[in-house]
Amino acid sequence: MTDRVLPEQIRNFGIIAHVDHGKSTLADRILQLTGAVSDRDMREQYLDRLYIERERGITIKSQAVTLQWDCDATQYVLNMVDTPGHVDFTYEVSRSLAACEAAVILVDATQGVEAQTLANLHLAIENNLLIIPVLSKVDLPSADVEGATLELSEVLECRVEDVMHVSGKTGYGVKELLDLIVRKAPPPKGDVTSAPRALIFDSIYDSYRGVVTYVKMCDGTIRVGDKIRMMSTGAEHTLLEVGVSNPEPQSRHSLSVGEVGYFITGVKDVRKSRVGDTITTDTHTATVPLPGYSNPKPMVFSGIYPLNGNEYSALREGLDRLKLSDASIVYTPETSAALGFGFRCGFLGLLHMEIVSERLNREFGLATISTAPSVAYEITPDGEKTLVVMNPSDFPSGKIKEIKEPTVKVSILSPKEYIGSIMELCQARRGVMQGIEYFGSVRAELIYVMPLAEIVFDFFDSLKSRTKGYASFDYNPEGSQPADLVKVDILLQGNKVDAFSAIVHSSKAYSYGSSISKRLSELIPRQQFEVPIQAAIGSRVVARETIRAVRKDVVAKCYGGDITRKRKLLEKQKQGKARMKLIGRVEVPQEVFVATLSSYK
């Protein structure tokens, strides 16, 4: 591949879709068709490099790859970005689309338009990208090609003939799609002669080469050996390697306007390559940075603790190393009386939280326990400043003037026959309906504003079970609203166990308290004395369960005689039990914490 490519011969495009709509399979066929990967080296989900991606069949990290394609007797360079589809990784999609001029919006012919399809479509429109509608999996017997084509054309307000039909499995229509991208997608704009400006759209950590920064060149040219400058921080580094992914790394002498590639400077801290920052050179310095985009804000918070208390420093090191490849993780040290030393971590969503825990286990051999997920509340105590509380243990005591909880705008796409059931579920979760829109004669989109706390537990599972798996949903931050919230503490023999504390709506305090008390009464081993388990709001107990004492049969040796002998032994036992209850401590096995907390994730 020659170093110098004219901007008119470059096409930058992304593939966006709902999870499991065939993005990675289509990307595989494109890699084969363009000759980037030989048939011998080809494997399924070629661009999904993380083992979790391959096991779960989902894309987590975006991948940018440079390909060559001949069309109309001219050779073009195609820069393709394969993006995630799950709602938790919308941020990955948004930053990848900043490197594109066109977006292939892919819809499964067997499923039709889904919630995340619409969310990603809005991202593409916000980035002023050319939209290319494509229907995938058209070769399947269950595909409703005609219905899905009509639905997609209605959503995009385009002609039915504009929707392309492809099959990533057989390769049908893929060549025609690439030709269409070349003919319809606009070439990148930029000035080759002006001061260099490159937009960072991703960065990953490589244990051998340090931070690999993925960039799109917007102006000028940057070469190996140049001293580059980060415009937000002013930090300077010498460029050791420049290249493109084809799809394996391929070093080049330089990158110029419109090209997508990578920079390596030998820096070991990925936080020095902030996504959205602009790179320039110190010899020909740009004065105005490119409009970047903000870092993702965590939506869900949870405490992560090592099962083995001696592995705290190993957990810190593991999180530090994960942060190098996943800049969206946020964590601060915290201490729990029940669980010891750990970290309060912020995640983009529940799937993100699950994947981080799994990576800590697989990559660093760390067995961890996660507390129940919570969100960030704004709490204003009487006469004091507003606090942001992410951990129930930090909930202030005393009189509270106002509590605000974060809300999200939820979009639910479902067949029309389940609308009543979905509305019932959303109302039970304190949702406020904003509108309903019908797509064709079969499907509808319901828009609700809901508290984020109501969807981080089991909303998705409940939605799927009520709609037999047909509904899909997506959400975006909407702001915050005042709410009647309380902190529920769980007490064992009068002592608070902070790991089980939760901030819940006052209407759900009893159900939370009674369910977790019942669960603990089933899991905690019986003691020599009676153990009360109480759920309390402040000093008011709202639910209680009791673990009955293990009782020795002290009168077994009495075979007859005076009844007073038996009474004396029973009275002595009763006094001993009372004394034991005063001084005894309830030992809660670690398995109880694991079992209880895992059931409330």
Swiss-Prot record:
Residues annotated to bind GTP: D20, H21, G22, K23, S24, T25
Predominant location category: membrane
Database matches in Pfam families: EFG_C, GTP_EFTU, GTP_EFTU_D2, LepA_C
Record's bilayer topology term: Peripheral membrane protein
InterPro entries: EF-4, EFG_III/V, EFG_V-like, EFTu-like_2, G_TR_CS, LepA_C_sf, LepA_CTD, LepA_IV
PROSITE patterns: G_TR_1, G_TR_2
Location of this chain's protein in the cell: Cell membrane
GO cellular component, one term: plasma membrane
Enzyme kind, highest EC tier: hydrolase
Enzyme Commission number(s) from the entry: 3.6.5.n1
GO biological process, one term: positive regulation of translation
Keywords: Cell membrane, GTP-binding, Hydrolase, Membrane, Nucleotide-binding, Protein biosynthesis
Domain tr-type G: start-end pairs: 8-189
Domain of life: Bacteria
Catalytic activity reported: GTP + H2O = GDP + phosphate + H(+)
GO molecular function, one term: GTPase activity
Entry function: Required for accurate and efficient protein synthesis under certain stress conditions. May act as a fidelity factor of the translation reaction, by catalyzing a one-codon backward translocation of tRNAs on improperly translocated ribosomes. Back-translocation proceeds from a post-translocation (POST) complex to a pre-translocation (PRE) complex, thus giving elongation factor G a second chance to translocate the tRNAs correctly. Binds to ribosomes in a GTP-dependent manner.
Family from the record: Belongs to the TRAFAC class translation factor GTPase superfamily. Classic translation factor GTPase family. LepA subfamily.
Protein name: Elongation factor 4
Organism: Tropheryma whipplei (strain Twist)
Lineage: Bacteria, Bacillati, Actinomycetota, Actinomycetes, Micrococcales
